[in-house]
């Protein structure tokens, strides 16, 4: 009986998963570098890079922080995933998986805690907005962010227009020499659809009027309440976005771990 030769297929690294992970992460890397570059450029324009103490001088949130932090995290993750997949480097791939997994669990924990301690979150959001109201004129990026939020959610202040008493330019004290005294920023104003030119002085002296009179000129609802209402109205969309991000993260972790297993299997046959 003639002898039969058995041929065993040697394990190999899956090219499809490898180059998909590489392509996905190179896009991630480029976007991260772009975010980081925008953040650093903005800081350079504001003189922060030449005076690091300016980072702590601002009473509210500097929106540029968001670009720098998000850009930095995306760049690190993109680099690890991209080079790890291309060079079949198990250390970088494991780093990518662990880092991405850590971010996933932090997001999950944040979501659970936000649901359980929603009253505390509401109080913190109120405090956060009021701190930024105080620093409204201190930074142009912060000013633009607050104006955008108040216009988008048709609100004024954290709980209402009187929160602008916290700002030295808008407070109603007799010692305030500002022309904006007892007023609110233009972003609080109820816009006239027929108005072609934005009236930036529409909020002047408006808080000297009675509350019922104010409603014809400015939005009297607070941004905390309006933000909560927006979340409830768009719950399906918001939940869909977060679920999509979570699934993408899980897919990236599984893809990286599968690639690590393939690389180890190939090395075991050397």
Curated annotation (Swiss-Prot):
It is a multi-pass membrane protein. The chain crosses the membrane at residues 20-40, 64-84, 95-115, 235-255. Belongs to the tetraspanin (TM4SF) family. It comes from Bos taurus (Bovine). Pfam families: Tetraspanin. Residues 41-63, 116-234 are extracellular. Interacts with ADAM10; the interaction influences ADAM10 substrate specificity, endocytosis and turnover. Gene3D superfamilies: Tetraspanin. Glycans are attached at residues 51, 171. This is Tetraspanin-17. Residues 1-19, 85-94, 256-270 are cytoplasmic. GO terms for cellular component: plasma membrane.
């Amino acid at each position: 009986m003639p002898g039969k030769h058995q041929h065993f297929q040697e394990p190999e690294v899956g090219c499809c998963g490898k180059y998909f992970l590489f392509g996905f992460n190179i896009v991630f890397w480029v976007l991260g570098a772009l975010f980081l570059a925008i953040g650093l450029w903005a800081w350079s324009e504001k003189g922060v890079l030449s005076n690091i103490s300016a980072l702590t001088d601002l009473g509210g949130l500097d929106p540029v922080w968001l670009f720098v932090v998000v850009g930095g995290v995306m760049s690190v993750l993109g680099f690890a995933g991209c080079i790890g997949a291309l060079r079949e480097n198990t250390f970088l791939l494991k780093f990518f998986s662990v880092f991405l997994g850590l971010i996933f669990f932090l997001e999950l924990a944040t979501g659970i805690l936000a649901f359980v301690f929603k009253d505390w979150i509401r109080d913190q959001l109120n405090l956060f907005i009021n701190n930024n109201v105080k620093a409204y004129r201190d930074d142009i990026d912060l000013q633009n962010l607050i104006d955008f939020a108040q216009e988008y959610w048709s609100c004024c202040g954290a709980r209402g227009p009187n929160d602008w008493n916290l700002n030295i330019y808008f407070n109603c004290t007799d010692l305030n020499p500002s022309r904006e005294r007892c007023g609110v920023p233009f972003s609080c104003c109820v816009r006239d659809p027929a108005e072609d030119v934005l009236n930036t002085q529409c909020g002047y002296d408006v808080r000297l009027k009675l509350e019922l009179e104010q409603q014809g000129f400015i939005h009297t609802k607070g941004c905390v309440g309006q933000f909560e209402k927006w979340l409830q109205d768009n719950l399906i969309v918001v939940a869909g976005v977060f679920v999509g991000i979570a699934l993408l993260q899980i897919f990236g972790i599984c893809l990286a771990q599968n690639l690590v297993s393939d690389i180890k299997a190939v090395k075991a046959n050397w």
